[in-house]
């Protein structure tokens, strides 16, 4: 898979640089950067993941649980547990959470993403 450009996020939402989605909360807690690499395209038990939200969740599982980290990955203080990662996936699966181009970049490539985390 080829590496693609930087994708920026807002409020646990990922958006392409051309279509940034407004944050749904006022207080930003922080952010992290992650490379959604080929290893994030597969679940822990080896089956292929089929959507971008699953892949972002798997990236955080690879970071926190399995210590399989890409060189571009940064730590976060919000998605340490399976339950927290499930919440992240649910948020990202909401309509409008990610643009179509962002989803395609994640599913079909290895983009570098930034996730901004907001309270609420």
Locate each region found by the language model.
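Soluble periplasmic/extracytoplasmic beta-strand elements of cell-envelope proteins
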Residues: 33-37, 91, 114-118
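Mature extracytoplasmic domains of secretory-pathway proteins
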Residues: 46-103
């Amino acid at each position: 898979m080829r590496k693609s450009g930087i994708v920026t996020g807002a409020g646990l939402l990922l958006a392409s640089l051309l279509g940034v989605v407004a944050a749904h909360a006022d207080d930003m807690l922080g952010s992290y950067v992650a490379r959604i690499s080929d290893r994030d395209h597969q679940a822990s038990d080896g089956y292929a993941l089929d959507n971008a939200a699953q892949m972002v969740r798997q990236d955080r599982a690879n970071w926190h649980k399995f210590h399989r980290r890409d060189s571009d990955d940064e730590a976060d203080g919000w998605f340490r547990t399976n339950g927290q990662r499930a919440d992240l996936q649910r948020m990202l699966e909401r309509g409008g959470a990610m643009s179509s181009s962002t989803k395609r970049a994640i599913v079909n490539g290895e983009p570098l993403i930034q996730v901004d985390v907001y309270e609420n």
